[in-house]
Amino acid sequence: RDRCLTNPELPYHAINSLNRLIQKTQAEVPVWADSLAHYWSVSQMDGRGNCTCQQCQTSDLHDGSPSGTMLKFVNQIAEHFPHKKIATLAYTYTRKAPLYTKPASNVVIQMCAIETARQGINFPIATSNIHATFRKDLVDWGKICNEILVWDYVIQFQNLVSPFPNFSTMQDNINSVSYTHLRAHE
């Protein structure tokens, strides 16, 4: 499980950790963690699930989704880095937009479509019935935030090196993302 996002000590540790990364010189950081970067990710762990303590459950229930609890935490981090973009995933249990909590102005939502059936045949996000809930979530997030990145999975996870003829779908997805004034991340 992810850490408890309602733990009052967690933002302090996350802010210090991120600040140390940002303060490092270029020679001290790996290529993937360029300290001059404008975007920094503060996101949930991959595939673990959210904290289910009483405080987190209450927060999740209030916002109708664990994304609200995540955003409350991320907003605390973003407040300390006003000149950086703090990106966070809308992914698995945080994909549904919260009812009340809104991202800070420097928080970027990175929508991920991994839950939808994309194996074998690739279906376009804009028109496929399989992606109806993703489209709804995308619209809902668009109502409450300034910037959304879309992480479109353009790979077949069952066999990473096999040919995956998805160029036409990629184009459809880029066009639909551009049409909705979002930024595509592939």
Q: Model segments located where?
A:
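Aromatic-lined carbohydrate-binding surfaces of glycoside hydrolases
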Residues: 1-174, 183
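Conserved small/polar residues in nucleotide/adenosyl-binding loops
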Residues: 180-186
